[in-house]
Amino acid sequence: MVAFTIRRLFEAAIVMLTVALLAFVLFRFVGDPVNQMVGQDTSLEDRLRLRQELGLNDPVAVQFARFVADAARFDFGISYQMKQPVTAIISERAPATIELALVAALFAVGLGIPMGVYTGIHRESWLSKVFLSVSLIGVSLPTFLIGIFLIYVFAVKLGVLPSFGRGEVVRLGFWNTGLLTASGLKALILPAITLGLFQMTLVTRLVRAEMLEVLRTDYIKFARARGLTWRAINFGHALKNTLVPVITVIGLQLGAVIAFAIITETVFQWPGMGLMFIQAVQNADIPVMAAYLLLVAFLFVLINFLVDLIYVRVDPRIRIYGRGV
C-alpha cells in the first residue's frame, strides 16, 4: 500500500509539472505581460523598469522555476484586468463552483445509481424504459441547450426559479455559501440539474451495464441456487461488485464537473471559476487563465489520487498487483 501511494504521488507530481510548463508557456509567450498591464502612453523607461521588476529579463529556466515555486505557494501574480491578486479572486469565486459541482454530483449519483440498478434488474418494465429514455436524452443534448430549455420552462414560463445569479449568500469565515438561504438554494436548482444531468445519464448507463454483466456470472447463479433472498443477491452481491468500476468513473466525473462547469456558469451567469475563466479569456488576463489551468489540473490529480486509494480498498486485487510489481 505504501509503495502504491508513493508511486501515485510521483505520477501526480509529473502531471502537475507538465501542466505547470504549459501554463508557464501560456503566461510567458502569449503576448507581452507588460503591454497588458500598462497603457499606451507609458514611457519606455517605465516599461523597462516593470520588466525588470517582473523578472522578465531573467533566463527562461529561472522564470519557470520561479513560476513553479510561486504556484506551489498559491501565488499566481496580479490580474491584468482586476488589478488584484489572482489568489484572492479565485478564493472569492471558488465556493460558488465547488458548491455547484458537489450538488450536481450528488444529483447525478443519487439518481444515477438507483436508476441504473432498477433498469438492470427490471429490464422489461415500463419505468425502466422511461429511465433509459431520460438517459438517452441526457447524453444526446448539449449542456447549454439543456440549460436554455430549463430557463425557458421554469424561469420564463412558470416563473418559479431564477434564471441567473447565485442568490443571497452568507459569509462563513473565508467561505461564502448560498446553501443557507432560500434564494441561494432556489438559484442552485437549475444550474445543478443542467450540470449534473449528463453525469447522471453516464452513471445510470454504466451501473445498468455492470449489473447486467454481474447478474450473468456464475457466483450469482450459485447464490440463487443456495436460496438467498432477492435482496441479498441483487444488493449484497451484484451491486457490491458493480460499484468497483463505478467508483472510478464517479471520481473522474467529479473532476470533469468542476472543469467543465464553464458552460453552465456562462449560461446561468453563475459567479464561479468557470465564468471567471471566460472573462479572463475575453480580456486576455493571462495570470488568471494560467491559475485556472493549474487549479483544475490539481483538482483532477487530487480526485484521481483519492479514487485510486478507495479503489485499492474496494478491490483487493489491486493490492496484490501492487506487491507483485
Write out the residue ranges for each language-model feature.
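Alpha-helical transmembrane segments of integral membrane proteins
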Residues: 2-4, 16, 94-127, 175-325
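Residue-level signal for discrete positions within transmembrane alpha-helices
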Residues: 12, 93, 97, 133-140, ...
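Hydrophobic alpha-helical transmembrane segments of membrane transport/permease proteins
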Residues: 15-65, 154-180
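Membrane-embedded alpha-helical segments of multi-pass transporters/permeases
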Residues: 16, 20, 24-28, 144, ...
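Short hydrophobic, aromatic-rich alpha-helical segments embedded in or entering the lipid bilayer
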Residues: 44-74, 220, 269-280
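Membrane-interfacial helix-loop-helix junctions in multi-pass membrane proteins
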Residues: 52-60, 77-86, 168-188, 281-287
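An internal, D/E-rich "acidic patch" concept
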Residues: 57-113
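Membrane-water interface segments at transmembrane-helix boundaries in multipass membrane proteins
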Residues: 133-141, 145-200
